Amino acid sequence: MEIFTLFTDPHIGTRRVANTTRESSKLLQEALYSAALEAADGPGKSICLGDLFDRSTNPEGVIVQGFAVAGRCRWVLAGNHDCANREGVVTSLDALQEMGCPIISPPNLSAPYFFADGPLYFVPHHASQQLFEQAMLDAAAHAGRERAGRASVLMLHCNYDQPFATEDDTLNLSPAIAQKLLESFDYIFLGHEHKPSTQFDGRVVILGNTHPTSFADISDKFSYQLEITDYEITLRRDRIWSKDERFASVMFGQELPDLRGVQFIDVIGAADEAVAVADFMQQVWENAPDALAVRNSVSVAGVSVADDEAEKPVVEDLRTRISRELDGTDLADLFSELAKEVAV
């Protein structure tokens, strides 16, 4: 019997501005790293199902954190946040692979790829939906031949049943393909989506991430223990983050509850003046020693002032996006200078 601990989407290096202070943003980064370390230290051999990093390239300190987590793992699957989808780009995950970490990623961007390790099958992030689907079908065909009558599982990093999510930076597993894959596999485990759920009577398991990165993905979080023999699979999950304990809604103007241990606080209600809301928000921060983010969802004079910047899609020009992606790297200053020259 082999034992594996499954976890996904630690998003090491995440930086949040909305709903945070400079100090709490750093604390959130540390919380994400700590959650990943704890998950990787679970029973048996640990496996990360993607998005070890929040961005494909990272400062040295973040890469060191990724090395500490990946070095504890049996395998680390490449997710969409880990990949650049451009030939010749060396990502942080590539760097870890060069340093000896067990990374599963496509050898090139133009061919389907799966990896098998006994009963475990992996399909990492691909550059297109077409390649991704072919890789899954190839894995199923291989398992059907080599694992017929014996236990096997498939591990992916993608959305489930979101047909619009088929671009190069996000992929999809449809129910129709899942049903076909389940002819060869006992279970399918998915990284990528941050809230846990199951499909096909529990045989398709969406793990959910290890720790909330913002208000958008708050839910109970779990790690999963997988016990595999030649002919039997046992799965259990352990709660590693509790929404009831770590999240709270607070009514504006009312006496504050005990906020010790609460990491995410949503301030709700209505007010006549914005100044009063600002004062109350400050009071919340002062009485929440463990807060990582406090959101203002109070409406003032009928106009919502909720700050959901981190969770809303942002439309930006190419130069702004490149600057944001390079922020914190050695290329940021160089790009800024080149952009100024082109503008002139």
Please provide the spans of the model-predicted regions:
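A conserved active-site cap/scaffold subdomain adjacent to cofactor or substrate pockets
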Residues: 187, 191-253
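Short histidine/acidic/glycine/proline-rich micro-motifs that form metal-
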Residues: 52-54, 80-84, 211-212, 270-272
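Structural beta-sheet core signal
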Residues: 6, 48, 76, 154, ...
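N-terminal active-site segment of His-dependent metallophosphoesterases
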Residues: 1-65, 135, 140-150, 334, ...
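His/Asp/Glu-rich metal-coordinating catalytic cores
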Residues: 45, 54-204
